[in-house]
Structures are given as C-alpha cells and as structure tokens.
Amino acid sequence: VFFAVLLVLQPSPVPERPMLAGAIIEAELGDPLWLLSETDRGNLLKLRAVAAGSAESGKDYELWVVPEEGRPLSLGVLPASETHQVGLSDEAQSSLSGSRTLAISLEPEGGSPTGAPTGPILHVTRLYEL
C-alpha cells in the first residue's frame, strides 16, 4: 500500500490597498488654488484652499461634477480659505467614478440659482489615482 501526500502552498493574499485619488486646481501661472482628494470609499471629497482667494464681491466659486453625459451636478460653494469636506450623493459618486472630471464656476453669492452653472467655467480638472 502506497500513500502520497501533496502539499500545496498558496501565497497569502495581498491586502488590496485603497485607491487614492487627487487633483490640483491651478491658476494660469501654475500656482495651486485648491487641492482635492477623494476618500478611499469615494463618498467624500476633501478640499484645501491654497491660494484661491475670495471670489469678487457678490460672487462665489462653485464646484461641479462633470458627468460623461448629462448636465453637471453641483457639489456646493467652495470656501476661499480653509479645509472643506464635501459629501457625495450616490448620483455624484457614480458620475465622478465615470468621468473623473470636476469644474469650478463663478456664480452668484450662495451658488447657482438654477442648479446648473450660470457663470463662467473658470477651471476644469480630473481626479487622478495617486
């Protein structure tokens, strides 16, 4: 009687690292205005104003997700200074995961009254994996 035992060693699974994404919104001269990062769950954007400065009197900067199709989705008014967090709705998460594109417009104080950009689009950027 002959018995054989075969041992198979499998490598330990490598834990999947969370994907990190970020963007830099720059002025024409290359100075960063805001730094953006996406949490590993994709449901929160963290923004830090670097050299943005305040919008002109009676105006605010507004952040938008630019989907691959359809109209932009507002993520709210951007602070001219400080760090700010923006919670993303399911719709915004879905749009951002597809297009990875954000835009900033100049809007009336308090943001767009229509839910769509009404002022000039000042900056467009993409989120990139870090």
Short names for language-model regions:
Residues 1-130:
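N-terminal targeting/export leaders
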